[in-house]
Swiss-Prot record:
Protein name: Adenosylhomocysteinase
Gene from which this protein is expressed: ahcY
Top EC class for this record: hydrolase
GO MF annotations, alphabetized: adenosylhomocysteinase activity
GO biological process: L-homocysteine biosynthetic process; one-carbon metabolic process; S-adenosylmethionine cycle
Organism of this sequence: Thermoplasma volcanium (strain ATCC 51530 / DSM 4299 / JCM 9571 / NBRC 15438 / GSS1)
EC number(s) reported in the record: 3.13.2.1
Catalysed conversion reaction: S-adenosyl-L-homocysteine + H2O = L-homocysteine + adenosine
């Protein structure tokens, strides 16, 4: 194989994904996906590439598209196709039409399993390609946004096969959402702006695990962080973690930067942009491009121009100017390299083992959203802990007896 840029990026990722490496040993021997067709819509970059190769090495026929028009690494796409013979349908900067055409192409070989990030592929096989659903065992969903859509489908009674919520596994959301999103979001912002974080007023919209990860990293780099929330419990958490909590339309007046991480649309409205500080930086860490109302901002703008790679400046009707990174799309992948390799090692290990569980147990599953089995969550945690060099205490027989008793007190 020619050692091109994409090939080297894949090899680098493989070298730093020890949990996947451990699982790979067994998959190579047992071939748990032999004869299984898997359609995937994920961010097509190096870590995802190693995950897709793991499934292929486990016997699967994998077809992959991107789950976001701006998140693909073209060098990795080329290497997967050329060096590994994998059908991959993606490029960075897809048009909306290309994006949906590529999703369709993953379905040209009818899938037994789908692995999705954000829910667009799942929606496709529940609408335009509903004819394929009868042969689908089930699937996995990677991210918060997609899980919200899945649960809405389940509630409406339209879910046609079982889906696993990988996002809410402990070894996913406690690490990927918090440490992964926190680091990679700032990586994307700093890569695209070259601006200082220390001393800046930064608004973080949303204090779920993604938002708190971003806020934690900003605080560590010296930013003054203001949080916006709709949930009083999370707002109280933010305050006790040392952050101010304000309404967006108030906070944005003092902010040098706003980062959204909510999974909700119109978090930063056009009305907010009008009262923002001049040249405020607007970035989105959520899955879709509607958290910052970019279309509304563009509609009412007098001028739009690209001021840096990935950054567009809009001059608004009142003369104010705002800088939007990556058209309001997922900043860590559109303007950066995505989550750290070791973080995605955990998430994709969960994905692989849950897909294996689905193959073995799909006949006993209903048309509903399932959590990742706790034994899989714990297994991934144990492998990673061992690789960190960590060791666990074990309970004595007397402690186990105490744990299960009710009559011992003070």
């Amino acid at each position: 194989m020619a050692e091109g840029k994409g090939f080297l990026r894949l090899e680098w990722a493989r070298d730093h994904m020890p949990v996947i490496a451990e699982i790979r040993k067994r998959f190579l021997d047992e071939k748990p996906f032999k004869g299984i067709n898997i359609a995937m819509a994920l961010h097509v970059e190096a870590k995802t590439g190693i995950f897709s190769l793991l499934l292929k090495e486990g016997g699967a026929n994998v077809r992959m598209a991107s789950c976001n028009p701006l998140s693909s690494d073209d060098s990795v796409v080329e290497s997967l196709k050329t060096d590994y013979g994998m059908p991959v349908f993606a490029r960075k900067g897809e048009t909306q039409e290309e994006y949906y055409e590529n999703l369709q192409r993953t379905l040209e070989k009818p899938p037994d399993i789908i692995i999705d990030d954000g829910g667009d592929l799942t929606k496709l096989v529940h609408t335009e390609r509903k004819d394929l659903s009868k042969n689908i065992m089930g699937g996995n969903e990677e991210t918060t946004t997609g899980v919200v859509r899945l649960k809405a489908m389940e509630k409406a009674g339209v879910l046609l096969f079982p889906m696993f919520d990988v996002n809410d596994a402990n070894m996913k959301h406690l690490f990927d959402n918090r440490y992964g999103t926190g680091q990679s979001t700032l990586d994307g912002i700093m890569n695209s702006t070259n601006l200082l974080i220390a001393g800046r007023n930064v608004v973080v919209a949303g204090y779920g695990y993604c938002g708190r990860g971003i806020a934690m990293r900003l605080k560590g780099m010296g930013a003054n962080v203001i949080v916006t929330e709709i949930d009083p419990i999370k707002a109280n958490e933010a305050i006790m973690d040392g952050f101010q909590v304000r309404r967006m339309n108030d906070a944005i007046r003092y902010a040098d930067m706003v980062i959204t991480a909510t999974g909700m649309k119109d978090v930063v409205k056009y009305e907010d942009a009008l009262v923002a500080k001049k040249n405020i930086v607007l970035a989105n860490a959520g899955h879709f491009d509607n958290e910052v109302a970019v279309k509304e901002i563009e509609k009412h703008s007098l001028e739009k121009r690209e001021v840096r790679e990935f950054v567009k400046r809009y001059r608004l009707e009142n003369g104010n100017t705002v800088d939007v990174i990556a058209d309001g799309r997922l900043v860590n992948l559109a303007a950066g390299q995505g989550h750290p390799v070791e973080i995605m090692d955990l998430s994709f290990a969960l994905q692989a083992l849950t897909a294996e569980y689905l193959v073995k147990n799909h006949q006993n599953l209903e048309k509903k959203v399932y959590p990742v089995p706790p034994e899989i969550d714990r297994y991934v945690a144990e492998i990673r802990l061992k690789q960190f060099g960590g060791e666990l205490d074990t309970l004595t027989e007397d402690q186990i007896k105490y744990l299960n008793s009710w009559d011992e007190g003070t």
